[in-house]
Amino acid sequence: MKDTYESPLNSRYASDRMKYIFSPDFKFRTWRRLWIALAESEKELGLNITDEQIAELKAHKDDINYDVAAAREKEVRHDVMSHVYAYGVQCPNAKPIIHLGATSCYVGDNTDVIIMREAMLLIRKELVNLLNVLAKFAVEYKDMPCLAFTHFQPAQPTTVGKRAALWLNEFLMDFQNLEFQLSQLKLLGSKGTTGTQASFMELFDNNTDKVKALDKMIAEKMGFDSCFAVSGQTYSRKLDYQMLTVLCGIAMSATKFSNDIRLLQHMKEIEEPFEKHQIGSSAMAYKRNPMRSERIASLSRYIIADIQNTAMTSGAQWFERTLDDSANKRLSVPEAFLAADAVLDLCINVADGLVVYPKMIEKHLLEELPFMATENIMMEAVKRGGDRQELHEKIRVHSMDAGRVVKVEGGKNDLLDRIAADSALGVTREELEGIMKPENFVGRAPQQTQEFVDNEIQPILDKYSDLLGLDVEIKV
């Protein structure tokens, strides 16, 4: 059916892997895992819950009766209680102890944390694969001189690989932030309606040790080290913001990467992959548009804007909780992850298929190199007895005249011919050609690139070698 809206993130951009993490199946199966963890922990701490009841809960943890839950929600207008009811229909013996002592946020918020963790683990996998692809490209082209740009004006040469190392460094910073945020991630735990654990104190006859143990046991059963020490009814919505700082950072890095590729493609130096039957324009048949890089920039802009939702939502929470977070959070958090997933898959695809045109790179570099070589030329002339100030003025005049030929007349850069013809400078054309070797102007760019990959990137690739080899698919 095509008669209703569907999110492009779902239909066009995000991977099936990420879409599953934010699917109803993953969400409601996690609810049931949390109810099982709660019941098991309460039993282990002495409540009257039987092995048979827990076995019944486990037997139906994955076969969710959505129709029963949906019908119940129409009646009671409460999603959690509707699923408690539906689970109880399948588990009549365990029905009395489902959700015992808990509030809605026990399943809602803990599940949100679990979903974000799973989604962030996938983001980490994608990011590691991107680091790997970009590192290979950087090392392969670390020695190839190219024109650098500041203010998008020609500047001191760098190398193709060193420029890629700049992209790599941006994504490395995102990886480091991701690792930190994952290391700090905690569950809400079992905190009750206002975060005081009052209902659990009642259940356990005011036994503080058991109530504290309940939190820890649930965390461990769900694969976490700990729960938040204090909270209201919900975990602090600042957590959503902190997680999205990782995605926003990735979007910032991807924007720079994709914009650089778009500019390089305009100059015909480097292109993103272009499929054999791909069409660039419906009117201009010759066009090879950088549509993947443009999509990266477009989706990244969405993520950068989306993080404002989590910032405003966090600040707007009243006292122990308010519900104006809910609708916004249901949109902003999943869509940020879906968009970041799409961005990273696109970045991997583009970086892995970059097409380099060495002759065009050399052409552009040699067109500008005479201007950049003037200081070296002047130093050579000074060593032969010339006056630095007089030489500077002569080279300045020659540079202005050569620039005029290029810009006004559309001619070739004849600066070297002018310098060679000036007897006051005393440098021959052959000597100028020796000075004009591009590799003499790139400084430590090749060494910087290799050292950066060896010292900063390779340890990550070694640590997470089991994550490499991700197969990404670009749908359109």
Residue ranges and their predicted role:
Residues 162, 241-249, 376-384:
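Short, well-ordered beta-strand elements within core beta-sheets of diverse protein domains
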Residues 1-198, 206-219, 280-281, 291-295, ...:
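A helix-coil-helix interface module used to build multimeric assemblies
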